[in-house]
From Swiss-Prot:
CDD domains with a match to the protein in the record: CMP-KDO-Synthetase
Annotated gene: kdsB
Record has Secreted as a keyword: no
Primary localization class, coarse: cytoplasm
Originating species: Fusobacterium nucleatum subsp. nucleatum (strain ATCC 25586 / DSM 15643 / BCRC 10681 / CIP 101130 / JCM 8532 / KCTC 2640 / LMG 13131 / VPI 4355)
Lineage: Bacteria, Fusobacteriati, Fusobacteriota, Fusobacteriia, Fusobacteriales
Reaction(s) this enzyme catalyzes, per UniProt: 3-deoxy-alpha-D-manno-oct-2-ulosonate + CTP = CMP-3-deoxy-beta-D-manno-octulosonate + diphosphate
Entry similarity comment: Belongs to the KdsB family.
Entry protein name: 3-deoxy-manno-octulosonate cytidylyltransferase
Keyword NAD: no
Keyword terms, alphabetized: Cytoplasm, Lipopolysaccharide biosynthesis, Nucleotidyltransferase, Transferase
UniProt GO BP: CMP-keto-3-deoxy-D-manno-octulosonic acid biosynthetic process; lipopolysaccharide biosynthetic process
């Protein structure tokens, strides 16, 4: 079983233009993501981009990159294009290009799960939420799972809704995915689904088509960079905790 990590990265962004090239303590964000992910047990790692500036930056810091179409609607679709070309890998790890604090253990946990579950098509991560404001925040996607740790639903709403008082844990979805290569290609050919579109969550397409997603719990939480404010949060966190690339 061979594992390929793919970091989809596009230049255009409605909230933070050119964010993969934003500087964080002397390095671009895409370099932070790449070099921290490179510490994992992946067999290979590549950035999939539609922009020559990002491509050149990755090559310049010693990474691998590939140019892809500008017509993709989400990261998984971009990854599927790479999967069509790189057929020697049977399992893919989708690493978000806007999460510079990624820990290699998160990637390794997905790798181990696929090694242990040969029939698994897709897996992802979750992190326990303790703060009520974080639970209510629609930018924190929540996930609920069955007793075997397969996703029942993902939502920007508070799920489960606390109609009665009870001892229940809330989990934030961490958007790092693992999939079998063939399933990524199959996913890319599925039509967008109603729940996916109303929640703006691409993983719901998988559930609506009747497939399962294994969800592993991680103790690591991430700060995704969608805005300038997020970027400043990451920079401050790195400084305060003396984190190195």
């Amino acid at each position: 079983m061979k594992f390929l990590g793919i970091i989809p990265a596009r230049y255009s962004s409605t909230r933070l233009e050119g964010k993969p090239l934003k500087m964080i303590e002397g390095h671009t964000m895409i370099e932070w993501v790449y070099k921290r992910a490179k510490k994992s047990n992946l067999d290979s790692l590549i950035v999939a981009t539609d922009d020559e500036r990002i491509y050149n930056e990755v090559i310049n810091f010693g990474g691998q990159a590939i140019m892809t179409s500008k017509n993709h609607t989400n990261g998984t679709s971009r990854i599927a294009e790479v999967c069509e070309k790189m057929t020697e890998y049977d399992t893919i790890i989708n690493i978000q290009g806007d999460e510079p604090l990624i820990e290699y253990e998160m990637i390794n946990s997905l790798i181990e799960t696929f090694k242990e579950n040969k029939d698994l098509k897709m897996a992802t991560l979750k992190h326990k939420l303790l703060n009520k404001e974080e639970i209510k925040n629609p930018n924190n996607v929540k996930v609920v799972c069955d007793k075997n740790d397969y996703a029942i639903y993902f939502s920007r709403s508070v799920i489960p809704y606390p109609r009665k008082n009870g001892n229940i844990s809330y989990f934030k979805h961490i958007g790092i995915y693992g999939y079998k290569r063939d399933f990524v290609i199959e996913y890319s050919k599925m039509l967008a689904t109603p729940l996916e579109e109303i929640e703006s969550l691409e993983q719901l397409r998988v559930l609506e088509n009747g497939y399962k997603i294994k969800v592993l719990e991680t103790t690591h939480s991430l700060i995704g960079v969608d805005t300038q404010e997020n970027l400043e949060q990451v920079i401050n966190y790195i400084k305060e905790n003396n984190i190195k690339i």
